[in-house]
């Protein structure tokens, strides 16, 4: 419901103060709605069946072979614990029975597609694949290139550290390249006011519906705060109103894949849409300067400075504040 501005009560000082407070609330809400009205992602229920790996399938079979009638553990990448019933034909999970999977490959996640356990991967010019990790939260690969860091900590916890840099509580945030949605999920956990997320790749969007660590925009817990759109942010940024966001999370693909998201033109747009004092975290990774011939983080820092930010290296990227 739109807050009342209390205009009829302006003659008293208390009602003036109330009206001004309501006006600030309404203004902040309207700033979010100044973001472009791209088509939202059609509601696709998130998968709730078992997610299998070669190791988890072997674990269930060993338990059955030892005579166990059930097994307790997680078949949703560590998000919850369930009691799984075991029999000669397969296993029962959340009131549904599944046959024993056939031969499974290493470093591959499988979901029940209604007929069999199928790998969570697609090929549309590039092979895109959801990949299990020792941390629970998966990463994903494009043509064998890992898109999220996993060597030292969970990709989800890595995202949380970066999101904390922009202090998301109560803010309107632009998430330029949604990916698996870990930035958005961590911002939601931290009490973000609204977050608008774009994703260009339809196959990555499909991965999200199968990943229990990816936030569901339609879930009750999200409270309508996550608006997820299929779109190219390098184009959509032109439609976003100036000064309409409080903070930005920018996690683009590698420079060689999406150079337009590292361009001065794009950075100028980021500076335009964020309010003065707003924070931006730009993930760059740590590309090898000797093999690549360039220092991408320093180049980003310099371009952001030219766009109107005060920028410095932080974690594996650049943290910038709008001057």
Go through the PLM ranges and name each one.
Residues 180-192:
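Conserved SAM-binding loop of SAM-dependent methyltransferases across substrates and taxa
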Residues 201-240:
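S-adenosyl-L-methionine
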Residues 288-323:
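Class I S-adenosyl-L-methionine
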Residues 277-284:
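Conserved beta-strand signature within the Rossmann-like core of class I S-adenosyl-L-methionine
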Residues 36-132:
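N-terminal auxiliary segments of SAM/dcSAM-dependent transferases
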């Amino acid at each position: 419901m739109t807050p009342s501005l209390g205009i009829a009560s302006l003659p008293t000082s208390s009602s003036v103060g109330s009206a001004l407070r309501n006006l600030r609330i309404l203004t902040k809400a309207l700033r979010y709605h100044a973001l472009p009205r791209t088509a939202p992602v059609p509601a696709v229920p998130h998968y709730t069946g078992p997610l299998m790996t070669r190791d988890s399938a072997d674990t269930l079979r060993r338990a059955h072979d030892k005579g166990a009638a059930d097994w307790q553990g997680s078949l949703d990448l560590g998000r919850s614990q369930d009691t799984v019933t075991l029999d000669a034909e397969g296993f029962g999970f959340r009131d549904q029975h599944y046959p024993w999977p056939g031969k499974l490959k290493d470093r591959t996640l499988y979901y029940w597609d209604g007929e069999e356990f199928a790998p969570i991967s697609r090929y549309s010019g590039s092979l895109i694949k959801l990949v299990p990790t020792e941390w629970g939260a998966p990463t994903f690969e494009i043509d064998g290139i890992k898109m999220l860091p996993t060597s030292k900590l969970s990709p989800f916890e890595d995202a949380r550290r970066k999101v904390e840099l922009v202090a998301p509580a109560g803010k309107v945030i632009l998430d330029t390249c949604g990916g698996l949605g870990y930035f958005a999920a961590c911002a939601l956990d931290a009490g973000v006011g609204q977050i608008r997320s774009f994703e260009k790749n339809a196959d990555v969007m499909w991965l999200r519906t199968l990943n229990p660590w990816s936030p569901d925009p339609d879930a009750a817990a999200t409270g309508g705060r996550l608006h997820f759109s299929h779109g190219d942010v390098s184009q959509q940024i032109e439609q976003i109103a100036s000064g309409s966001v409080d903070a930005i999370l920018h996690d683009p693909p590698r420079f060689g894949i999406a150079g337009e998201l590292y361009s001065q033109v794009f950075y100028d747009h980021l500076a335009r849409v964020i309010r003065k004092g707003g924070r931006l975290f730009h993930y760059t990774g740590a590309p090898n300067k000797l093999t690549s011939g360039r220092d991408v983080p320093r180049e980003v820092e310099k371009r952001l400075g030219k766009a109107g930010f005060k920028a410095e290296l932080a974690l594996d990227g650049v943290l910038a504040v709008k001057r």
